[in-house]
Design a protein with these regions (language model features):
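Beta-strand/loop nucleic-acid-binding surfaces
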Residues: 91-104
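Aromatic/His-enriched, Gly/Pro-containing loop or helix-boundary segments
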Residues: 102-132
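Sec-dependent N-terminal signal peptides
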Residues: 2-13
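Alpha-helical and His/Cys-centered functional microenvironments
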Residues: 9, 18, 155
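Surface-exposed, glycine-biased beta-strand/turn segments
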Residues: 17-87, 97-99, 124-126, 131-132, ...
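Histidine-centered catalytic micro-motifs
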Residues: 148-154
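Short coil/turn motifs at secondary-structure junctions
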Residues: 157-159
Length: 222
C-alpha cells in the first residue's frame, strides 16, 4: 500500500509539473526528432523542435529558475544552456545560435578569464535567475547539428536522469500517425540465453497479410 501511495504521489507531481511548463517558442510546436530515438551510438535524450527552417528564433524559459550550466563548444550541443527549476527538474537547450545579453556578457567574461573560447560553466542559483517566459537564448545550428532546430531536454536535477519531454507538451503537439513496427532484434545474453536454440542475434520482421471477411459462402442463404 505504501508503494501505491508513492506511485500516486509521483503521478500527481509529474502532472502538476507538466501543467506549469510553457513552450519554449511562441509559434506552433512541430517536432523533427523524438525522445528515445536510436542514434549512431546513443539514444536521443530529448526532443527536437523545428524552428521554421531558420536560426535566430527567441527561446523562452519554460518556467522560473536559474542558469545552472552553460556550455560553448564546436561539438555536441554547441552553445548549450541548462536551467534548473524549483520543481526538481532541469531543462536543457542545445544548438543555440546565441544567448540573451546578460548571459552572453557572463560567458565572455569567463572566456577571457580562462583564455579559451570553449567553456563549460557551472553557476550558483543567485548568479543568473530567470523568469518563466523570459527570453534566454536564440535558436541555432551549432555543435553536432545537421540543420536549424532546438534540442530540448527535461532532466531530474538530482539524478540527472532524462525524462520524456513529450509528457509536458502533449496537449500542444498534433500526432495523427500511429507507430509502425519495422522489426524486432532479439539479442541473447552471452553465455546465458538462446533464441531458437542459437546464441546468435535474431531479427524478426512483421508479418503482413491481407484481411478477408469470414462469413457465408456465395449463394448460401442465412
Amino acid at each position: 500500500m505504501y508503494k501505491l501511495y508513492i506511485a500516486i504521489l509521483f503521478f500527481f507531481i509529474q502532472t502538476i509539473s507538466a501543467q506549469q511548463l510553457r513552450q519554449p517558442f511562441d509559434f506552433p510546436i512541430l517536432l523533427s526528432g523524438n525522445f528515445g530515438e536510436l542514434r549512431n551510438n546513443h539514444f536521443h535524450s530529448g526532443i527536437d523542435f523545428k524552428t521554421q527552417g531558420v536560426e535566430g528564433k527567441p527561446i523562452h524559459a519554460v518556467q522560473d529558475g536559474y542558469v545552472s550550466r552553460i556550455s560553448v563548444s564546436p561539438w555536441g550541443y554547441g552553445n548549450g544552456l541548462y536551467l534548473t527549476h524549483p520543481d526538481g527538474t532541469t531543462t536543457v537547450y542545445g544548438h543555440l545560435q546565441r544567448f540573451a545579453p546578460s548571459i552572453a556578457r557572463y560567458i565572455k567574461t569567463q572566456q577571457y578569464e580562462q583564455e579559451s573560447f570553449n567553456v563549460n560553466l557551472f553557476l550558483d542559483p543567485d548568479q543568473l535567475p530567470v523568469k518563466k517566459g523570459e527570453i534566454v537564448a536564440y535558436s541555432g545550428n551549432t555543435g553536432s547539428s545537421g540543420g536549424p532546430h532546438l534540442h530540448f531536454e527535461v532532466r531530474d536535477t538530482e539524478s540527472e536522469e532524462v525524462l520524456d519531454p513529450i509528457e509536458y507538451f502533449k496537449e500542444k503537439i498534433t500526432d495523427t500517425r500511429a507507430p509502425k513496427i519495422q522489426g524486432i532484434l532479439v539479442c541473447p545474453q552471452p553465455g546465458k540465453g538462446v533464441v531458437n536454440g542459437s546464441s546468435r542475434k535474431l531479427e524478426l520482421k512483421p508479418v503482413t497479410a491481407k484481411m478477408r471477411q469470414i462469413g457465408a459462402s456465395p449463394g448460401h442463404e442465412t
